[in-house]
Amino acid sequence: MINQKKIAGEKACEWIKDGMVVGLGTGSTVYYTIEKLGEMVNNGLHITGVATSEETSKQAQNLGIPLKSLNDVAEIDITIDGADEIDTDFQGIKGGGGALLREKMVASASLKNIWVVSEEKLVRNLGKFPLPIEVIPFGWKQIERTLEKEHVQTILRRQSSGEIYVTNNGNYILDIVNQTFRDAEMWQEKLAQIPGIVEHGLFLHYVDIIVCAKANGEIELIKK
């Protein structure tokens, strides 16, 4: 069986050159990117990684990829990350893995952003996948009520154990469900006005190249 995630994840490594500072995303597709980069580092490639989550940091360290924090780099040459959905206008939803805040900060500091996906992630309109919003624990219920008044349904993210999911930043995640985000700019503005929302998973002006693996194993490169 063809592993689309592995194909897309490894393909993106072709953009990585010696001496680069590389943003390392989080998720099941970019996992393969990081594995491949670890192999390349062990074969002599010199890069510095900036991890977007504790999970990614642990994986990179285990593979021998040198890391620095975002505070310690002036800019990032390329960030490779996954996405939950991408529409035809290069707008995306990210954060299914809970790392949306750090992912967006790293993406903002990057000269180029590459997203690695399998073809089912390409959609006409955003919204089939829930939109995560990271909120501070204090008063999170009030944020939920505020959105309910706007007829926006949210679900507090929990772990499989039933405990509340807590991000690497100590925050909670509310997932907006049953909603289509045709006017993503409007949604971005709406969410930015609600106190207590730290960040949302709409990534509207970030991606430069999409590496999409198809079911037959072929790669499609979609450039902005």
Swiss-Prot record:
Pathway terms, separated by semicolons: Carbohydrate degradation; pentose phosphate pathway; D-ribose 5-phosphate from D-ribulose 5-phosphate (non-oxidative stage): step 1/1
UniProt binding sites for substrate: T26, G27, S28, T29, D81, G82, A83, D84, K94, G95, G96, G97, K121
Entry keyword annotation includes Isomerase: yes
Record bears the keyword Isomerase: yes
Top EC class, one word: isomerase
CDD domains per record: RPI_A
GO molecular function: ribose-5-phosphate isomerase activity
Family: Belongs to the ribose 5-phosphate isomerase family.
Function statement: Catalyzes the reversible conversion of ribose-5-phosphate to ribulose 5-phosphate.
The protein's name in its UniProt record: Ribose-5-phosphate isomerase A
Gene behind this protein: rpiA
